[in-house]
Amino acid sequence: RERCYITKENSNQFPQLVKFIEELRSAEVHKKIGSLIGRDLSNSFVRLEVICDREGFWLKPHCDIKEKLMSSIVFVNPHGESENLGTDFYDEKLNKVKTVPYKNNYGYFFTSGPNTWHGMEKKEIKKERRCIQINYVTFATDWQVKN
């Protein structure tokens, strides 16, 4: 499992992702997303993480911390991995109710809460399961939103 947060320190290695972060920071975008999820994002920070999971990876069902105002994943599937490798969502009794398909350039977003259980059961990963995780958070990152 490899993970890399995009920071000002490593931003020169990820110019396209920095452009994406700048869009997410813009008042127009964060206000629109805030209206969709019913949250005020005007004092938040963007956190973007590049994720590369390999064989053996799994993530137990959990709810995100309250400091994550919005969680989002965009799947990047250049190796034709199984669509079954998407995120699993669970009910309050931890019964799996939905797997979001792991398709290239496909994703989802949601807000944190007491019944937002998600994770990934252990599944066969042939090469890599890549995705980009985007969060609006209450704690400081290098990318405060603009107002």
Which residues make up each language-model segment?
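Short amphipathic alpha-helical segments, especially helix-boundary/capping motifs
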Residues: 5-11, 32-33, 46-50, 93-95, ...
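Short, conserved, surface-exposed binding loops centered on an aromatic residue
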Residues: 22, 35, 39-42, 61-65
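Short hydrophobic/aromatic beta-strand micro-patches
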Residues: 75
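Catalytic core of Fe(II)/2-oxoglutarate
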Residues: 51, 56-57, 63-68, 78-147
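A short coil-to-beta-strand element that immediately follows conserved catalytic motifs
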Residues: 38-49, 83
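Non-heme Fe(II)/2-oxoglutarate
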Residues: 1-36
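Short secondary-structure capping micro-motifs at structural edges
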Residues: 17-20, 57-61
